[in-house]
Amino acid sequence: MLAVKSSSDKTFRGDKLQIYDSLPKDNGLQRYLVGGAVRDKLLNIDSYDRDWVVVGSTPQQMENLGFTAVGKDFPVFLHPKTKEEHALARTERKSGSGYTGFECYFAPDVSLEEDLMRRDLTINAIAQDDKGQLYDPYHGQKDLSDRVLRHVSDAFVEDPLRVLRVARFAAKLHHLNFTVAPETMDMMSEIVQSGELAHLTAERVWQEWHKSLSTPHPEVFLSILKECGALAVVLPEIDALFGVPQPEKWHPEIDTGIHTLMVAQQAALLSPSLPVRFAAQVHDLGKGVTPESEWPSHKMHCHTGLKIIKKLCERVRVPNEFRDLALLVCEQHSNIHRAGELKPTTFLKVLNKFDVWRKPDRLDDILLCCQADHAGRKGLEDQPYPQKARFEVAYQAALQVEVKAIIADGFQGKDIREEQEKRRAIAIEHALSELASS
């Protein structure tokens, strides 16, 4: 069992007492810190959000204490000073389809144990009071110690969103060797087979996918969804990559789906940028529609993938920043991989395509995606990627060509742009020659 921090732990308990002191001394409020804040503290992980459950109170009592009501479907209140969410203890009963098909019951007689029972995983069903005492009726501490993600009760199957949440927690805690309990994975598969995932809104799918991108292992989110069958429902474009072969000469892992997971892992190692991690996961979607008669070759995937990415982003409502980077990586990653063969004019065309003159940070993002693609191959994870340096040198050389010098030489109108392109190509050629000879 994991050790519990004492009441002298100022990073966790001390500031909670300060919050209590900001309320009337005789308020009698029974509130407990719950969920991720307790879980992450027990795992020695930084936690930035704190949620509270309040037992034995009514909405009127909360408002009398200065809390502001914000909940629509059930009573949630914001603390008058910290603005942290406080929810009245409640129970839930399945009344319809999807993750919103629940009837909530809240009243002063709902116990802490009853409230914790409605939560998804045992490690999220631990509460702590203002004295530092832990309440763990569903043995979440043991599962923390055993590194297991386990459902609290059979009611787990009633909420399809939990499939994505468990996959995200698996990605978040994979570096600590957490695994999904077999019986919980069975329940996730049961949810998939029930058809309940179809009731998830695009916003909720993207919300969980987006959160998974910020975890240490985003690829685990996809692999867990694949294992329980959910990937084919919520992200069929990625699911279609599994079982599609690639040339073994370039891809010892062969399977495009496995390659995608490896690229996702490498992208997370190379960059904290969520758009970069997203683009890495979807850059090869075109391979999923290559006719079997052409396997294992995928000559058109850089082109066919564009339409798929656009439709995916529209369906799941992916932000434009993510979509735009993904489209550029999809279209141009093969060109970047061939940097050792490109002419100076082709380098320039690619740089212009990226609009690096107005968006200089974009080049590094794209190159990191391509580096992740290069490293995301079985046995080749540590292979050098000189293509990145070649494009960086080409960009810096072209950047030195100044318009004012061209104007000073007498060029006007559209001739300025044409001369700039010529000089940039020449500068790139010279810079790459120097790089080759160094």
Positions of PLM-derived features:
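Catalytic cores of the polymerase beta-like nucleotidyltransferase superfamily
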Residues: 1-438
